Amino acid sequence: MRILVIGLGVQGIKRVKVAGSDVSATVDPQNPSADFKLIDDVPLNAYDAAIVCTPDLEKLRIIKYLLVNDKHVLVEKP
C-alpha cells in the first residue's frame, strides 16, 4: 500500500520511519524536506492511504479531501 504522510512534525517523522518504503510522498508546507507543500499538489494516483499528522485546526479539511477522493485515512489524535 502506498502511503502519504501529511505533516512532518515529531509524529509525522516517526510515521515515515515506521512506514518505511511504503511511503510514496510527504506533505508539509513548512518542512523543506517534504515532497509537496500542499495535499492538493499530490497526484491522487500516487497514494492509496494517508496518515494525517497535522495540527488540529487543519485536520478536518484534509480528512474531508481524502475521504471524498476514496483514500484510507489514519489520523493522529488531538
Predicted features and spans:
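Beta-loop-alpha module in the N-terminal Rossmann-like domain of NAD(P)-dependent dehydrogenases
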Residues: D35-P78
